[in-house]
Amino acid sequence: MSLIKKKNKDIRIIPLGGVGEIAKNMYIVEVDDEMFMLDAGLMFPEDEMLGIDIVIPDISYVLENKEKLKGIFLTHGHEHAIGAVSYVLEQLDAPVYGSKLTIALIKENMKARNIDKKVRYYTVNNDSIMRFKNVNISFFNTTHSIPDSLGVCIHTSYGAIVYTGEFKFDQSLHGHYAPDIKRMAEIGEEGVFVLISDSTEAEKPGYNTPENVIEHHMYDAFAKVRGRLIVSCYASNFIRIQQVLNIASKLNRKVSFLGRSLESSFNIARKMGYFDIPKDLLIPITEVDNYPKNEVIIIATGMQGEPVEALSQMAQHKHKIMNIEEGDSVFLAITASANMEVIIANTLNELVRAGAHIIPNNKKIHASSHGCMEELKMMINIMKPEYFIPVQGEFKMQIAHAKLAAEAGVAPEKIFLVEKGDVINYNGKDMILNEKVNSGNILIDGIGIGDVGNIVLRDRHLLAEDGIFIAVVTLDPKNRRIAAGPEIQSRGFVYVRESEDLLREAEEKVREIVEAGLQEKRIEWSEIKQNMRDQISKLLFESTKRRPMIIPVISEI
């Protein structure tokens, strides 16, 4: 059945996130005068983003054109896809489309952030068709590590614009995790104009190990454990959590969760029937010590680096609930991102030092939730797109995916490597990338949205690395003299007792600068402060090779 509704003219595709990074998915598709947002995800901060809680895409372009926005279409319930939805809805009105579980998780996010706003939610599935003025939109089931994942298909007169979301192919999975390859093939036969596809594992050869094989090998590994077993995984990896529950039941072990991030999403999914949990399998973490060590499994969960951080604290005996003991076994069911590799290596060393046995994480007992090379080529061959846009990955992953598309038969000149804010235009004849819109990161610090910029981050780095140096002086401007001070206060810069000579020298330098400023015909406070910053910075760098943040404080009587 053809879902083409009318003859279209102009198409624009704009990534606002999810390119050059593995997170923060957000893609804008405009067909004539209608705009559609595909996913609205967040990113957890990188190490250098000191004090930042989360990062979301800059949606200033969407806000400038909000009357055109017809809806937010979500592929699955991970934070990379839905984490920014509540922030978007604070700034504009738009209906939200997603699977039953995804919508439930969005509602929970809105509730957690105390956003009391009437939102139009539409629950969609593999059979849903949403009709708009210029296009029709349908969906197809995909496989990911969370149930009810979907791909989105925007039907235009030029063919379908297909957004895969995050996916892999696994014939061993059924029910809420099963892909609808038949529906994908139908879309491919109807004609795919543009394929926008997940690039996360585009550099990994072959296929993922099927999940039924993973569970079999996990069972064999866990069955050999004689003491307490701790499994570390992301709270969002529902497949892995279900597998641990299955194995625990077979081994007659109780299961307890360690980590707050799992509680809300797990409880929602459990109530909706997405988890199969044998009776009396779960116990509170506070009751673990009531059971023999060989009768429990602890699942340490969290978002991003939280599970690894928890293990590190446990290994150093700094965790407030549980610590690693001699004879514990630990399994990390985590795919290490580039910025996590060093942290994980250090944590493994800490665990071994604390007496833990590490169950090796290899292809037999762990699989990615993203398609590897052959799975990505399979999607391309099923869809047979005219144009191809690799997304959801670092730039090197996008390039690797572009090469796979060329191998699968897509003309190289019809493959677009895009960055945030790039605009791909199609006017009925040519597809060109010749425009850019505002894009970037919005940093969330506490309840502040976008009020932390690069200057603030620079200052935080300065404070973290070199400390702070405060010079306080009280002036009597009427009599042009120093009434009190200078007084020097330092934090995180030098140990005061061992640097008394340097601090006295700094006090004298401040006195010289201030007294010179007081002799001027017109006293310029800003100029005096800047001279203090410049000259004190030079003095301190010559003595210590460090540049603390210098704050001059001048008060008057």
Curated annotation (Swiss-Prot):
Listed binding positions for substrate are H366, A367, S368, S369, H370
A single GO molecular-function term is: zinc ion binding
Tell me which cofactor or cofactors this protein depends on. Zn(2+)
Key words of the record: Cytoplasm, Endonuclease, Exonuclease, Hydrolase, Metal-binding, Nuclease, RNA-binding, rRNA processing, Zinc
SUPFAM superfamilies in UniProt: Metallo-hydrolase/oxidoreductase (SSF56281)
Q: Which GO terms describe its biological process?
A: rRNA processing
- Transmembrane residue ranges: none
One Pfam family in the UniProt entry: RMMBL
A single cellular component GO annotation:
cytoplasm
Give the note describing cofactor binding and stoichiometry: Binds up to 2 Zn(2+) ions per subunit. It is not clear if Zn(2+) or Mg(2+) is physiologically important.
Localization:
Cytoplasm
Q: What class of enzyme is it?
A: hydrolase
Write down the EC number. 3.1.-.-
Q: Which residues bind Zn(2+)?
A: H76, H78, H144, E166
Which family, according to UniProt? Belongs to the metallo-beta-lactamase superfamily. RNA-metabolizing metallo-beta-lactamase-like family. Bacterial RNase J subfamily.
Alphabetized HAMAP family for the sequence: RNase_J_bact
Q: What does this protein do?
A: An RNase that has 5'-3' exonuclease and possibly endoonuclease activity. Involved in maturation of rRNA and in some organisms also mRNA maturation and/or decay.
Q: How does it assemble?
A: Homodimer, may be a subunit of the RNA degradosome.
- Supply the name of the protein: Ribonuclease J 2
